[in-house]
A protein has these predicted regions:
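A solvent-exposed interaction/effector surface
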Residues: 1-146
């Protein structure tokens, strides 16, 4: 399921997203609904070619996970039908490659945060996943300045 965590420098990447907040029990349904909405609207946006699917999230607030569910795109665009332009951030981040199904995400994120603690790195609270063609995913946690 896992590989080692590494620190990487990432570039800002434009995204097309649906902004949502969801309780953990509803994450699969919320993800599917947001991705269906995005698929319906994305071809009409002036965002250029679509890249990999992604989800950006910040720590839960009152039991709800704030998320930007979307895809990497070539350029920013005007909002349309609830799809807004956003970015994956630039900076130093912890990178972790998860192998296997999405049910492994909680354990994978725990691995990232445990590694940060053991290595004395402070996450900034901005995290994201970039999904591959299979169920594998690349996980990133932006680092606060050490």
């Amino acid at each position: 399921m896992t590989s080692a965590c590494t620190i990487v420098t990432v570039e800002r990447q434009p995204t097309a997203v649906v902004r949502v907040e969801a309780v953990f029990a509803e994450l699969p349904q919320v993800q599917r609904a947001a991705r269906a909405r995005l698929a319906a609207v994305l071809p009409a946006l002036d965002a250029g070619p679509a890249g990999a699917a992604c989800t950006r999230w910040t720590p839960p607030v009152d039991g709800k996970l704030p998320m930007e569910i979307g895809t990497i795109v070539a350029r920013p665009f005007a909002a349309r039908e609830g799809i807004v332009s956003s970015t994956l951030p630039a900076g130093r981040a912890v990178r972790f490659s998860m192998k296997g199904g999405f049910e492994n995400l909680p354990l994978a994120w725990q691995t990232v945060f445990d590694w940060c603690k053991a290595e004395n790195h402070a996450p900034a609270g901005i995290n994201w996943e970039i999904y591959g063609a299979t169920e594998d995913a690349e996980l990133f946690a932006l680092l606060a300045y050490d």
